[in-house]
Every structure is written in C-alpha cells, then in structure tokens.
C-alpha cells in the first residue's frame, strides 16, 4: 500500500511539474520579451538544425516603414487594433463558409501568430492549438499592441533563412526596413502565408495581383499616434 501511495504521490508531482512547465514557462518568456529583443524562436532553431542559414537583424518598430506595418495588418489581420487576440467576426465567417461547403480555413490573428512563432513548434494538432490559445491570452494581457507588432515583424519567417523585416527588406529589395516603398511593403506582406514558396523580390502573377489589392487597402489602416494602434 505504501508503495502504491508513493507512486501516486510521485505521479502527482510529475503532473504538477508538467503543468507548471506548460503554463508557467510562457508567462516567464512573455515577461522577459516584453522589453528584451527575441534572440531566436523554435522555428529558427529547427531550421538551423536542418542546416539552413539564419539572416536576422532586430530593429525597433520606428525603424520599420509605416507602409509595412499597414500592409501586414491589411493582409494578415485587418481588425488587429480592435480585437483582444481572437477575431470572433473572422472566426464566425470561416465557420459559416465551411458550413456552405468551403474548406475550413484558419482565422489566425497577428497576436496568435506571434504567440505561436515565439513559443511553439509548427503543426496543427489540438495540443499545440490549445497552447497557442492560452499563450495568446497571456500575450494580449501582458503586451501592448505596439509590442506585439514589433516582435512579430522581427521574428516572422520571410523566406528560407530570412527572419524579420530588416533582413527581408535587404534580401529581397536591397534596402532597409525603414526605406521600403508601399509596393515593396505590400509584396512582403502578401508572401507571409507561404514565404518559402512565394518570393517578394521575384513575385509571380498571383503575388503581384494580391499585392496590388493589399496596397489599395493600406490607406484605411490607422496606426494611431504611437505607430501601432495607440
């Protein structure tokens, strides 16, 4: 009986430890990276282990052209400044489209993508989705929108071995992130869903057409007084 009690006690301790790691670790990371630059993400580490290079240069949000900020919001998350991490309107629309026979699509916000890129592995299983939702709630509670956008634009993948706006601008267009034109910004925003297959610097017909659409929408994005929703 004592042996069984001991095993049960150790089992509970292990479960408690896992609970703390899964739920407490994101909180610690978010507190640190609320002010500190992000040195690497799980995806960057994975790509390095696969033998891929790493081009990345952290820059503050004010060193990223407003055109790129507008383009990314217009393309990836039009209600970024209004929602609290989850765009319920977009989720309802995606579900309605699915019920009409369309393929079920994601309604991932910039907040969700930032949480995923910062702390999680790639994949579509329910465990990762659940952790992503939890991390997104924490992210929105602890970070202002400006910080979410700043981190996203510095860690997102923009091509094989290319991470962040500064590296992407220099790789694809030979300019700094601050010097991007509206057209270049729109092209960079459009390739985000598939950056390893689509090229902002050598756009195909679809990317070019989509970029023109996004460029037309950019003027409607209000960045606020602080340059990111504030």
Swiss-Prot record:
Q: Does the keyword Phosphoprotein apply?
A: no
> What does the record give as the reaction this protein catalyses?
[GlcNAc-(1->4)-Mur2Ac(oyl-L-Ala-gamma-D-Glu-L-Lys-D-Ala-D-Ala)](n)-di-trans,octa-cis-undecaprenyl diphosphate + beta-D-GlcNAc-(1->4)-Mur2Ac(oyl-L-Ala-gamma-D-Glu-L-Lys-D-Ala-D-Ala)-di-trans,octa-cis-undecaprenyl diphosphate = [GlcNAc-(1->4)-Mur2Ac(oyl-L-Ala-gamma-D-Glu-L-Lys-D-Ala-D-Ala)](n+1)-di-trans,octa-cis-undecaprenyl diphosphate + di-trans,octa-cis-undecaprenyl diphosphate + H(+)
Q: Which InterPro entries does the record associate with it?
A: Glyco_trans_51, Lysozyme-like_dom_sf, PBP_transglycosylase, Pep_trsgly
EC numbers for this chain: 2.4.99.28
GO cellular component: a single term = peptidoglycan-based cell wall
Q: What's any GO biological process attached to this entry?
A: cell wall organization
Question: Gene3D superfamilies annotated for this entry?
Answer: Biosynthetic peptidoglycan transglycosylase-like
Pathways per UniProt:
Cell wall biogenesis; peptidoglycan biosynthesis
Q: Which keywords does this chain's UniProt record carry?
A: Cell inner membrane, Cell membrane, Cell shape, Cell wall biogenesis/degradation, Glycosyltransferase, Membrane, Peptidoglycan synthesis, Transferase, Transmembrane, Transmembrane helix
Compartment list: Cell inner membrane
Principal subcellular localisation of the protein:
membrane
Recorded topology in the membrane: Single-pass membrane protein
- Please list the GO terms describing molecular function: pentosyltransferase activity; peptidoglycan glycosyltransferase activity
**Sorted alphabetically, which Pfam families does this protein's record hold?**
Transgly (PF00912)
Membrane-crossing residue ranges in chain numbering: 13-33
Q: In which family does this protein belong, per the annotation?
A: Belongs to the glycosyltransferase 51 family.
Task of the protein? Peptidoglycan polymerase that catalyzes glycan chain elongation from lipid-linked precursors.
Q: Which NCBIfam families match?
A: mono_pep_trsgly
Protein name in UniProt? Biosynthetic peptidoglycan transglycosylase
Question: From which organism does this entry originate?
Answer: Rhodospirillum rubrum (strain ATCC 11170 / ATH 1.1.1 / DSM 467 / LMG 4362 / NCIMB 8255 / S1)
This protein's encoding gene: mtgA
